Regions:
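Jelly-roll (double-stranded beta-helix
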Residues: 1-180
Length: 180
């Protein structure tokens, strides 16, 4: 299954902790957990705590807005534009330094069942059987579909084929899911 997505058409739902909102791109089910893996885009409006997800690995990438800090016990990470950062879902983190609304891209995987690799690329990619491609800038040929910023595709149990830049300024956020 290969599905095109656009930010403007994704439904908005509250965060697990009620402190913000998210737009789910895809949620692949698991027989014994709420999901096997999940991709979403969250709105960053205020400093505050992250939702706790025990047994889940997360990767966050700032898509828009000013850099901010993610803080917790012995953790002080600067989250900057288009730089993926992986962390354990049970870490008690909070965001600090949000001065204007922003967006972040989130990938969550059940730690014992799947793993995610998230990269920003500017060249041709040939992804595996599960993942998400999100256009950061420029235009891309994502399999059979052309996409621009704030859009992309996800795929599950089927490769989309080649992901290729169509403009010289093209940047793509590519997530590859590997089942364990």
């Amino acid at each position: 299954m290969i599905v095109p997505v656009q930010l403007s058409t994704l439904p908005v739902t509250p965060w697990k902790n009620g402190a913000g909102e998210t737009r789910e791109i895809v949620c692949v089910p698991s027989p014994d957990a709420p999901f096997l893996w999940r991709a979403s885009i969250a709105t960053l409006q205020n400093d505050g705590p992250f939702s706790c997800f025990p047994g889940v690995d997360r990767v966050i990438t700032l898509l828009a807005g000013q850099p901010l800090r993610l803080k917790g016990e012995a953790i002080d990470h600067a989250l900057t534009l288009w730089q993926p950062w992986a962390f354990a879902g049970e870490w008690p983190l909070r965001s600090e330094g949000i001065r204007e609304p922003g967006l972040d891209f989130n990938i969550m995987t059940q730690r014992n069942r799947a793993a995610a690799e998230v990269r920003v690329v500017d060249d041709i990619q040939t992804p595996g059987d599960e993942g998400v491609a999100w256009v950061l800038q420029g235009r891309w040929q994502l399999g059979e579909r052309q996409c621009e910023a704030q859009s992309g595709i996800f795929w599950h149990q089927q490769t989309p084929g080649e992901l290729a830049p169509l403009t010289t300024d093209a940047l793509l956020l590519v997530t590859t899911i590997v089942r364990r």
